[in-house]
Amino acid sequence: SGPSMTRRALFGPKVAPLIQAASLTLALLLFLAACGPKGSYENVGPEELYEALAAGALVVDVRTPGEFAQGHVPGAINLPVEEVARWADRIPKDRPVYLYCRSGNRSRKAAEYLARKGYTNLYNVEGGVLAIARAGYPLVR
């Protein structure tokens, strides 16, 4: 049948469907890897935040300067989420970064943005300052 032999002719009727299935699976995995986020983040609670703080993690409060002044995690730096595009490149990629806000929504948005930029060592504090205060952890002014 010449140069245009089919897979079925080359490998027999039982092997051809397996090759086809393997090819489709590989194509799907490559597609998902290419379309997925470059980085990732994990949701954590106040306890994990304060353990990481003691271990030297970078803690970023993404609230407004006014909110930050009313009380923040000791050692946190204030980088408002509205300005994430300006400050994102200054955050080290090789160090754990913990993000929080009032309730966890703005910090989640910042974490998603940084993850798209390739950050993988990211943690979003679920519940934010509200959860931190409820759990009895200290805030400073």
Regions picked out by a protein language model, each given a short descriptive name:
Residues 7-11, 20, 24-25, 29-57, ...:
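Rhodanese-like catalytic fold shared by cysteine-dependent sulfurtransferases
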